Amino acid sequence: MDLQLKQWRSQQQQQHQTESEEQPSAAKIPKHVFDQIHSHTATSTALPLFTPEPTSSKLSSLSPDSSSRFPKMGSFFSWAQWQELELQALIYRYMLAGAAVPQELLLPIKKSLLHLSPSYFLHHPLQHLPHYQPAWYLGRAAMDPEPGRCRRTDGKKWRCSRDVFAGHKYCERHMHRGRNRSRKPVETPTTVNATATSMASSVAAAATTTTATTTSTFAFGGGGGSEEVVGQGGSFFFSGSSNSSSELLHLSQSCSEMKQESNNMNNKRPYESHIGFSNNRSDGGHILRPFFDDWPRSSLQEADNSSSPMSSATCLSISMPGNSSSDVSLKLSTGNEEGARSNNNGRDQQNMSWWSGGGSNHHHHNMGGPLAEALRSSSSSSPTSVLHQLGVSTQAFH
């Protein structure tokens, strides 16, 4: 094996010597010349960024022989690349000195960039730098192959087939796709209408409750707890289940209107205009019309004349034998009103309090009423005899 290797080596050396003798001119050419020729042919096609255009006077000194001044670097750069390197070095010196770069140094760079094809910038590794991009390059949005078509894809591979809306990049269907909005407009009701309807409903409800409570109170005297409502003309007692302040205010207004109507009806007949006398029956169901028809009306007129219009409260007292002062009094607040109105209101309040005496909270009203007015106004008749006659007449009805 060793002999065979030695023979093969000797044969190779002989062949190499014979080839070198046949080509003597190739051995005389220096090595750096081959490298320069090879690099010129390889880099001229790989870097077509700048073209040699020596138009200015400052670039006249740059020539192909300039590489001979730098024999070590001439083998690594072509003539065009060396010229561009000196141009960039000169621009860099202006920038370091803080002076303005002359326009004639920048014109060759602009011309070389404009003559290049657009496909070079789409795949250039330095396209993210703005100073390497031409003026017409506006990014990916300007590269729309179909500018008049809607750009919405809806998560698919193909685009929408409709045309874009005027001034937008989507069609009319996809223009509002990304917005968060409700499909139906929400109408907010105004507070004025809501308050007006609530007030109207509360007034209607208060009117119905007022009629119901007044009817039950006047006709049957009210069996539950009593409350006092102050109206415009005076006050009276009623029984009901509502305790809210808003209903009390509505009740007071409605009661004042009812009081005015009752005043007009009292001018014709004092005791038949009330709700309790409309059915002509008492709490036990007995007829009381003959008793009140026989009652003298002169005593009632004297009682109305005796009440003073300036008094703030009307007191009804019953004088018992042996007592000079009144033991039982009925308190009715009439307020400071005019003379004619206070007479009518006082008479209404006395009648109402007389009928409300059937409740559990007004035990001392049982001995009052129109009989007390008549007994107080007439001095000729005896209170005890009249009360005795009243008890006999009520027993006869029973």
Swiss-Prot record:
Disordered, as annotated region: 1-32, 299-398
Location, primary (coarse class): nucleus
Subcellular compartments: Nucleus
GO CC terms, sorted: nucleus
Protein keywords: Activator, Nucleus, Transcription, Transcription regulation
Domain WRC: 144-188
Biased composition (Low complexity): 1-17
GO molecular function, one term: transcription cis-regulatory region binding
PROSITE patterns: QLQ, WRC
One Gene Ontology term from the biological process aspect of the record: response to gibberellin
Short sequence motif Bipartite nuclear localization signal: positions: 149-159, 177-184
Composition bias, Polar residues: 299-350, 383-398
Keyword rRNA-binding attributed: no
Family affiliation: Belongs to the GRF family.
Primary role: Transcription activator that plays a role in the regulation of cell expansion in leaf and cotyledons tissues. Component of a network formed by miR396, the GRFs and their interacting factors (GIFs) acting in the regulation of meristem function, at least partially through the control of cell proliferation. microRNA396-GRF1/GRF3 regulatory module acts as a developmental regulator in the reprogramming of root cells during cyst nematode infection, leading to the formation of the syncytium.
Domain notes: The QLQ domain and WRC domain may be involved in protein-protein interaction and DNA-binding, respectively.
UniProt-recorded name of the protein: Growth-regulating factor 3
Provenance organism: Arabidopsis thaliana
Lineage: Eukaryota, Viridiplantae, Streptophyta, Embryophyta, Tracheophyta
Name of the gene this protein is made from: GRF3
